[in-house]
Amino acid sequence: MKRPVLIGITGGTGSGKSTVAKEIYNKFDEACIAMIEQDSYYKDQSSIPFEERCKKNYDHPDAFDNELLIDHLKNLVDLNVIEKPIYDFEAHNRKEETIKVEPRDIIIVEGILVLQDPKLRELLDIKIYVDTDADVRIIRRLLRDINERGRTVDSVINQYLTVVRPMHMQFIEPSKRYADIIIPEGGHNRVAVDMMVANIKHLLQK
């Protein structure tokens, strides 16, 4: 097996980056592609009381255990199996269980700050930024956090105004300059997704 192709997909919360990642993932046989979500690598917070965990800024680079993520990606590149963490968004902490991820020809790394960390960036063969209007992103975030993460409307809106938007402007938006490809309109941009798939297939044939 050759060195895996690592693809980084980033963008603001609710931008459609997960949709783009899934669209690309679904274009390949499951035996040759793996998905690594940066959200799985939020730091372990077992030593912090739940009330304090609820107040933490989860859109700041310091919230992520990028050291572990980078180590896991290097292991996959070296064709080693990893144990990917599982994060519980209601408890704001890692679960004890992990998910075994085996090396694949294609590794997708998806998350809001994938292009922010220089050490993480340099591992990526293709860097994608998904660009979507802020109004669309906040609506998607609202629906996701209420339906999938057990949040209230007030808490989501408050978090967006005080944390999510400022962090987007400070860290996520500036990382766009490191992207090889910028995809507007998220997962609805079928042409861009098809072009990416063709490019990945070309890299695999080298």
Swiss-Prot record:
GO terms for biological process: CTP salvage; UMP salvage. Gene3D superfamilies: P-loop containing nucleotide triphosphate hydrolases. One of its GO terms (cellular component) is cytoplasm. ATP binds at residues 11-18. Pathway: Pyrimidine metabolism; CTP biosynthesis via salvage pathway; CTP from cytidine: step 1/3; Pyrimidine metabolism; UMP biosynthesis via salvage pathway; UMP from uridine: step 1/1. It is found in: Cytoplasm. Pfam families: PRK. Its EC number is 2.7.1.48. It comes from the Bacteria. Keywords: ATP-binding, Cytoplasm, Kinase, Nucleotide-binding, Transferase. It catalyses: uridine + ATP = UMP + ADP + H(+); cytidine + ATP = CMP + ADP + H(+). GO terms for molecular function: ATP binding; cytidine kinase activity; uridine kinase activity. PANTHER family: URIDINE KINASE. Belongs to the uridine kinase family. HAMAP family: Uridine_kinase. This is Uridine kinase. It comes from Clostridium botulinum (strain Loch Maree / Type A3). The gene is udk.
